[in-house]
Design a protein with these regions (language model features):
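Positively charged n-region of N-terminal signal peptides that target proteins for export
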Residues: 1-5
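Bacterial N-terminal signal peptides
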Residues: 7-17
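N-terminal beta-strand motif that seeds the catalytic metal site of vicinal oxygen chelate
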Residues: 20-45, 60-62, 68, 119-122, ...
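A generic structural micro-feature
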Residues: 28-30, 74-79, 113-116
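Extracellular structured ligand-interaction cores
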Residues: 33-35, 53, 80-82, 119-121, ...
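Core segments of cupin and vicinal oxygen chelate
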Residues: 39-93, 151
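Vicinal oxygen chelate
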Residues: 40-44, 59-60, 92-93, 99-167
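Active-site beta-strand termini and strand-to-loop segments that position acidic
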Residues: 85-90, 160-163, 173
Length: 174
């Protein structure tokens, strides 16, 4: 009888605790991750950077035809392709969606974060800086400021820019 009561208690506790550990976000959102669309000048150059330097993986791609792009308000009738990258191939991982319209940017390249408005940088938390720094060196990517530098006892900080000038903060242990 005692074992039955303990089992029943555990079953009830797990049933009521399960929603607290759910992967579904509360409120109005269907996913807890954010998908970010980034327009780049040269898709192949950006894919090379994000896959080989940053270490993202390509998970899928799709096209948006001219009429559909206009209908959705995404462009004034320009067709485009989107390549989805993630830090890991997981449904829960945030999506980094790259697309190109084959045009040069209409604004100068930023040298520092406050040089423009809008999204200016992303922060990626890494398990170890060593493989990231090796890839940065291998692909001749310039680190900005006096980086890598220590943030605190346990974490280093590196700042780089992608081929279009978007800033990427990398934070993690040495």
């Amino acid at each position: 009888m005692k074992d039955l009561l303990i089992s029943l208690f555990l079953l009830v506790a797990i049933t009521f605790a399960a929603p607290a550990f759910s992967l579904n976000p509360p409120g109005d959102f269907a996913k807890s991750g954010i998908s970010v669309g980034l327009v780049v000048e040269n898709l192949n150059k950006s894919l090379d950077f994000y896959q080989n330097v940053v270490g993202m993986v390509k998970t899928s791609e799709f096209s948006v035809e001219s009429a559909r792009a206009k209908e959705l308000g995404l462009s004034n009738g320009d067709r485009f392709d989107v390549t989805i990258l993630k830090l890991e191939n997981s449904d829960q991982a945030a999506e980094w969606k790259l697309m190109s319209f084959g045009k040069k940017p209409a604004h100068p390249r930023q040298k520092f974060v406050p040089d423009d408005t809008g999204m200016q940088y992303i922060t990626l938390y890494v398990k170890s800086m060593k493989p990231i720094l090796e890839r940065i060196k291998k692909y001749n990517v310039k680190t900005l400021g006096i980086t890598p530098t220590k943030l605190d006892e346990n974490r280093d900080f590196v700042l780089i820019q992608d081929p279009d000038g978007n800033f990427i903060e990398l934070i993690g242990p040495k």
